[in-house]
A protein has these predicted regions:
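Predominantly extracellular beta-rich ligand-binding scaffolds that present long acidic/polar faces
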Residues: 1-103
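C-terminal accessory segments
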Residues: 77-145
Length: 145
């Protein structure tokens, strides 16, 4: 889950603080909750709130704000349905047989070929050292398929 807020409430008092720059690119925001992303801006204060999310697969209700550019929203909101995932293995029920979670993209993943080439040029290698730009269509997330 990801929460980006420019406020917090402590002891019944709302405190605001600036979010001067929060940028998420070529990423996957996915998990076991129906809503995996929360953006919150205190509109009663003048605290900065500069959030940009681009070329990202998000599990949650589609939000229509300028904060999102070329984002893709997960089709299903079923909390426990493992087929909603875009990864090879995130099913905790079969850990003994399958090994631990595998966050590499599944062959049918919705996150394949959706990345921005300009972003992947800045970060050309995935966590395995694989070239994200080899096929000209970078994938979202930490691993290139």
């Amino acid at each position: 889950s990801v929460r980006i807020l420019n406020y917090v409430t402590q002891n019944g008092v709302r405190l605001t603080f600036p979010v001067t720059s929060a940028v998420i690119e070529n990423s996957i925001i996915f998990g076991g909750n129906a809503e995996e992303l929360e953006l919150g801006q205190d509109t009663t204060s003048s605290a900065d709130y500069n959030v940009l999310i681009t070329n990202t697969l998000i599990k949650g209700k589609k939000l229509e704000t300028p904060n999102f550019v070329d984002c893709h929203w997960a089709k299903s909101q079923n909390i426990r349905n493992a087929s909603d995932t875009v990864f090879v293995n995130t099913n905790i029920d079969n850990i003994a047989e399958t090994g631990y979670f595998n966050f590499r993209l599944d062959s049918l993943s919705h996150a394949r070929n959706l990345g921005s080439v300009s972003v992947s040029t800045l970060y050309p290698l995935d966590l395995d050292g694989k070239d994200r730009n080899a096929d000209g269509n970078p994938d979202l997330g930490a691993y290139e398929r």
